[in-house]
Amino acid sequence: MQYPLPIARLIDNYMKLPGIGEKTATRLAFYTMDMPEDDVEDFSKSLIQVKENLHSCSICGNITESDPCEICRDANRDRSTIMVVEQPKDVMAFEEMGEYNGLYHVLHGVLSPMDGVGPEEINIKSLITRLQKQDEVKEVILALNSSPEGEATAMYLAKLIKPAGLKVTRLAAGLAVGSDIEYANSITLKRAVQGRTDL
């Protein structure tokens, strides 16, 4: 038996979300159908508002309702440091941490030649232009994931940025507490050694 068309469409739409398979999408569709109408309206409005009201900051590429974004406008931020991240959600994670008070630059991805993602497809050109215009920047922190693509992107960016005389750093990363060295991958071990501190 096939589902009625409205449910089938809703299932198909839920399946467009990352990590949502057919079973989960079906569960969500039926849950949505059982929700109060006001909640469904709020849900649909929030989806539309995200698409209509959010855009990328013209300076850093973070998501924002106003341009430039709140972080770029904040005169109390440390303008000598720019942290380069992959996605807007990474900015949110660092902001929640509350330890970093510099600026950001969001790439909206990483280099991945296998997927057809080169330097032109992510927000690299605007980073280089920004670094050329903003004399107060002294350090660029590459806060990219430890995936092969993240590592390749970090190396590529370092080669572009270092000739300008800026300090380029990478987040220290290493072994998780309680993990066995023999099961750690080479990138984790390399970063653990490079990020070591004196005792």
UniProtKB/Swiss-Prot annotation:
Q: Which residues form a coiled coil?
A: none
Q: Which family does it belong to?
A: Belongs to the RecR family.
Recall the GO molecular function terms of this protein's record.
DNA binding; zinc ion binding
UniProt keywords (A-Z) are: DNA damage, DNA recombination, DNA repair, Metal-binding, Zinc, Zinc-finger
Organism annotation: Lactobacillus gasseri (strain ATCC 33323 / DSM 20243 / BCRC 14619 / CIP 102991 / JCM 1131 / KCTC 3163 / NCIMB 11718 / NCTC 13722 / AM63)
The cross-references to SUPFAM superfamilies, in alphabetical order and at most eight, read:
Recombination protein RecR (SSF111304)
Q: Does the keyword Phosphoprotein apply?
A: no
Provide the protein name. Answer: Recombination protein RecR
| Zn finger (C4-type) location | 57-72
